[in-house]
Amino acid sequence: MNFQADDRINISKLLDSVEAKHNFYGIFTLFIHSFVILKRLAQKRNDIMKKLTYENIAHAKELNVYLEQGNRVLDALGYTDHSQKHTAKVAVTAGKILKKLGYDAHMVELVRIAGYMHDLGNSINRVDHAHTGALMAFHFLRDWGAPPEDIAAIISAIGQHDERSGIAFDPLSAALILADKSDVRRDRVRNTVPETFDKHDRVNYAALSSKLHVDTHKKVITLNIELDESICSMIDYFEIFSQRMLMCKRAAEVLGLRFKLVANGNKIA
């Protein structure tokens, strides 16, 4: 069959038209598929974050195994209680600090998670437990499908919480430090023989109550402690915990606050 020149032109136009339509539908289909995938990813992230909450991880059996092991290690070494009661208190207190300061619900949830996980490293060794705990938390959070930016925020806070090597550098690390260092109370002492108390036992046993209060108007965060001075004087308390108090001062500054320590109604720092 022979084609005339005009026929070849018409066929060429037809092919161009078909190719153009094909490209249009291809691009349109790709766009729709991309939109659907992005929507599914967003939904998946939302689903993960709904599951990845302080309340949920607090009931994660595998996580609690390591926290319990860490507490047993510290018990054998003569340390105060570092059980889930401590980590839960730190989680709740840290969350309250950021909530009081107006941070969004997501930030509050992240600091609660960091607070609950912060002592994981004690299951390996008390020495450098902040860093080993951060690495352990990384694996848990990655396995649970947490977004990288959330994992980074949580493990950074955990890695900075120990006074021997850490420093507050952002709201999460600051709130975690303040919550952890303010958990001073009599029932953390496991030693039942007062004559054999070490300095930490003595301070904790002397603490009849301790409360952390945030005054957003005056921009002050105050640790109020009621001490039994027959066991530990206010000056002794400050001397023993001076490094921790300096860490709290820095943490408060990161949050735009001043740190105050009040014992039995008297300002110590």
Regions found by a protein language model. Name each.
Residues 2-9:
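Extreme N-terminal basic, low-complexity initiation segments
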Residues 3, 24-31, 35:
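Aromatic (phenylalanine/tyrosine) cluster motif
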Residues 11-21, 25-26:
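N-terminal amphipathic/hydrophobic targeting modules at extreme N-termini
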Residues 31-48:
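Short, Lys/Arg-enriched N-terminal segments with co-localized hydrophobic residues
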Residues 45-129, 140:
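Acidic/His-rich, divalent-metal-binding segments that scaffold phosphate/diphosphate chemistry
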Residues 75-76, 99-214:
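Divalent metal-dependent catalytic cores for phosphoryl transfer on phosphate-bearing substrates
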Residues 183-269:
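Terminal helices and disordered tails flanking the catalytic cores of nucleotide-processing hydrolases
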